[in-house]
Amino acid sequence: MTLLPHALSRLLLPALLGFIALPGYAFDEFITRDGHRLLEGSQEFRFAGIHAPELHRIEDDARGTCTADPRGWGQYFRWPTADEQANWIKALVKSGHRAMRVYVLSVATPSDAECGRETHILPPAEPDAMPRLNEAAMVHYDRMIALSEQYGLRLILPFIDHWKWWGGREQLAAFYNESADDFYDTNSKTYAAYQDIIRQVINRTNTITGRAYKDEKAIMAWETGNELKASTEPFVRKTAALIKQLDSNHLVIDGTYLKINKFALDDPNVDIISNHFYTTNDNNNPEQVQQDLQAIDGKKVYLIGEFGLRDADGLNAIMQAAVHTEHNGARAAGAFIWGFRGHRHNGGFYWHKEYTGHYSYHIPGFPEGEPNEERKVVDLVRKAQAQMAGFDSALPLPAPEPPVLRAIADPRVRIDFMGAPLGRRYRIERATNMAGPWKVIGDNISDGLQEYRPYEQALFRDTGALVPGQMYYYRVIAINESGESDPSNIAQVVLP
């Protein structure tokens, strides 16, 4: 029997399992660094993916804009359910993702109550005290880490945002009547609060695994923050040193944006240098990969933390540069295209529309996403994943697992089901007896609408000749190019 190398077996396991559910395995080791390479055990660790920023907090675009938010971008948010988080992580892993960078910890703003929002970081209980972690929020963060361990996904976790969208440095500084720029001043109250947040997070005990975050192998790296473009040498030096002092198990990413800091290249506590590519910054091109690798010159690991918001051919050119470009033997460890959204608990997908007109991508890709080149983007990412593992092309996707059918009040109004990871289409069946026979009432049903609005739309309605007072039974089967799932759970309803 020929044994696959360790790294390849991790990548191929979902495809080789086919109809079998993913195992609940624990990682054997932390991800480590050897010069410009990441290692999983003794094997080089490289990854490509579609960036999934919201594994721990969701912008609910279907609800529209909260006008009470004075920032002019008042978004509604919600916490993910356990079903949602498991579904998303399985979709990522089964499609070939080995690692994922999520978005930051959110910071409280004055308009949160009016917009029905909760955040991860709350104001101090007393003036000039330290911020507090919101336990109601952090249990979802705990579960994200636990599920990533269970299904085999390594996490990159940034702390605070340069920007205000989820609440960032400006909102943290407001707790202390300081300015947003004081965040980068290592003598400020805001920076002291930032340091305390880092301490609280790293030392937190996961309520699901029972382990401190600093002992969680699912965590690959801590990132100082998201797009911290005003980072100074004292800021990076003190922050990286604090993280390493608290946590000797995990790697540290300099979260600076748009430049390679020479001082970070010489800092023994910084392991990974990251950059983000966007057209608005004039760097959304494959040549930027070579420029960054030359600037880093093999002193650190190189990560393309985000790129996107352009056509699929352009994305592919950058992704192929990430896979193949070398400078004195150093290559990008990973690259993420912005951005992914997953299934909703009761059906359809979450979505987000960018200012460029691009939509978030839904895995495994759907005909409804053709204007967004969705399937093409998913496929180019899967090809890059395979190439990083030493293959020319990706293996077929595994067949989907069963979807989850939700309770039905009136099948003539709506039948809701949570789509299966990797399901492309669905068959809906009805019977008048639990044991059948089953009649197909909907075939080739898609849940892949780009802008699914659950408050106004239904995934499916039973338009057959139904008899009031009759008991009906329903089930759903997921299908993709590799096969079909077992039937879902059965939902029964007496027609009103």
What feature does the model see in each segment?
Residues 427-468:
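Recognizes extended acidic, P/S/T-rich segments that occur
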Residues 464-482:
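Beta-strand-rich modules
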Residues 388-423, 468, 483-496:
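Pro/Thr/Ser/Gly-rich low-complexity, intrinsically disordered linker/stalk tracts
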Residues 403, 415-417, 428-429, 462, ...:
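An aromatic-rich alpha-helical recognition segment common to small helix-rich domains
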